[in-house]
UniProtKB/Swiss-Prot annotation:
Species this protein is from: Bacillus subtilis (strain 168)
Organism superkingdom: Bacteria
Protein name: Uncharacterized protein YrzI
Family matches, as Pfam families: Bac_small_YrzI
NCBIfam families hit by this protein: Bac_small_yrzI (TIGR02413)
Length: 49
């Protein structure tokens, strides 16, 4: 019974991210979006020259 509770607790902790993890993921996502947009602009401008 104790082992089951232990694993249940671990599972619940993994499901809920800490605020720092959430903020870090948001930053990474924002950087990714900015780079993607920059590349698309570059491709668009190079194709029309």
């Amino acid at each position: 019974m104790t082992i089951n509770l232990f694993f249940l607790t671990l599972t619940i902790k993994k499901r809920f991210k800490s605020l720092e993890e959430f903020e870090r993921e948001q930053q990474i996502e924002q950087i990714y979006d900015e780079m993607k947009e920059s590349q698309l602009k570059h491709l668009y401008l190079t194709n029309w020259r």
